[in-house]
Regions:
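Bacterial Sec-dependent N-terminal signal peptides
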Residues: 1-26, 327
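Subset of outer-membrane beta-barrel
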Residues: 22-419
Length: 419
């Protein structure tokens, strides 16, 4: 009985992230975004056009897109993130991606291929078991959930850009420790799950505005616009148990559907092309496909209860569907600001916002007005980015010391190498 109560307490603590009144699932942190820039943008990631190092976690098809730009990218959280709860819960993530655009070496091969890796964990703090006759600690342990996710994505251009992706997630969970007649035993579970994703990008400016050019004070300015639509289904796998197979719980299988519209202006300064301004709007919706009733566990179809007209166009959430919406604006490829909102599935509104600072635009401007081969080489091949996201959760209102979560990440990008 003690173990069952403890398991329930841990589940409730983690579930302050999202409400799962419609179903009981294990490892709800699997559905959390790990990319800090996308956390800031309303916890989106299904349809955004992102080159962020961990931007493929929700939708592995993103690797087909980002491989057009990144040869290699690495991102990590420099410090752990504290999750407000009744226990000292912390989380941290890091990962990388590598890719190649074959079109750069052969124009007849409009193909990109990328691979990615993500590691993430959720730690519940330190627990101590004491004996009935003495306060001395018999066992000290730290419950933790973690996973390693390996992804593969590919993209192909035929008027539009078509991208597909696949992820294999290997997870481990240490729930508690038990004192048995044969010694101390770990209550733990291991398993695997898969993610599938698709992303279609319609390059509006390439198709219809490619020859539209403005000349202002000697500077050449061109419009840029894309529309993308994405779908992903995450955490397809077997049920998990710690003690009794008859008491196993399903993984949080989730369907995601979304779109992104972005437009901006590129400016030519001498021999350097710089993105002057870029704005994007993202709308996404997701549904937990797991349902439990008196007959057992059931799974909805690949789209669940998602209704595009209601949940994506009108952006109306309900008791089953979570709706994400985000605005992102970038200036001079240097400063990015994102803001978003998340609501639905019986929890209150989550507000997100964040900023990013990149060396990309600043170095391009320096190259435009200076003659330095070393600087030109660094600018053409390397970029550093710092990102910060703030999430305001209103789930427990005033029952927690703070409902704000702060995430930070540092990323390195290597690009434009032709092998």
């Amino acid at each position: 009985m003690r173990v069952n109560i403890y398991s329930a307490i841990l589940f409730l603590l983690v579930s302050n992230h999202f409400a799962f009144a419609q179903s009981e699932v294990i490892f709800p942190f699997f559905i959390d975004q790990v990319s800090v820039p996308l956390l800031a943008a309303g916890q989106t990631g299904t349809a955004n056009l992102t080159t962020e190092a961990l931007g493929f976690y929700f939708n592995p098809a993103q690797l087909g897109y980002s491989s057009r730009f990144n040869n290699f990218a690495f991102s990590f959280m420099p410090s752990i993130t504290n999750i407000p709860a009744f226990l000292p819960i912390t989380t941290r993530s890091y990962g990388l991606q590598a890719g190649y655009d074959f079109n750069k070496i052969n124009k007849s091969i409009p193909l990109t291929i990328g691979v990615g890796f993500v590691h993430s964990y959720l730690n519940y703090g330190k627990f101590t078991f004491t004996g009935s006759q003495s306060p001395a600690a018999l066992i000290e342990y730290e419950p933790e959930d973690s996973y390693n996710s390996i992804s593969l994505g590919a993209g192909y251009k035929y008027f539009a850009y078509f991208n597909l992706g696949f992820s294999l997630k290997m997870f481990h969970s240490l729930l508690t420790k038990q004192i048995t007649a044969n010694g101390i035993k770990d209550a733990e579970a291991d398993g695997t799950s898969i993610d599938l994703g698709a992303l279609v990008i319609l390059p509006l400016s390439e198709l219809w505005f490619n020859k539209t050019i403005f000349n202002i004070n000697g500077y050449t300015i061109k419009p840029k616009s894309n529309f993308s639509f994405g779908y992903a289904i995450n955490n397809i796998g077997e049920k998990v148990y710690f003690f009794d197979p008859a008491q196993s719980d399903p993984l949080p299988r989730i369907a995601r559907l979304g779109y992104n519209l972005n437009f901006g202006l590129d400016i030519q300064i001498k021999n350097v092309e710089l993105n002057l301004i870029d704005y994007s709007f993202t709308g996404e919706a997701d549904d937990i496909l797991v349902k439990r009733d008196t007959t057992g566990i059931k799974y909805d179809g690949m789209f669940g209860k998602l209704i595009p007209g209601k949940h994506l166009i009108s952006l109306v959430s309900d008791k089953n569907i979570v709706v994400h919406k985000a605005h992102t604006i970038s200036l001079f490829e240097t400063i990015t600001y994102s803001t978003g909102r998340v609501n639905g599935r019986q929890y209150q509104i989550i507000k997100t916002e964040g900023v990013g600072i990149s060396t990309e635009g600043l170095l391009k401007l320096l190259c435009a007005f200076t003659e330095n081969k070393v600087l030109n080489y660094i600018t053409g091949h390397f970029t550093l980015e710092y990102s910060r996201a703030n999430l305001n959760y209103a789930v427990y209102q005033n029952t927690l010391p703070s409902n704000n979560r702060k995430y930070e990440s540092i990323a390195l990008y290597i690009k434009n190498f032709d092998f």
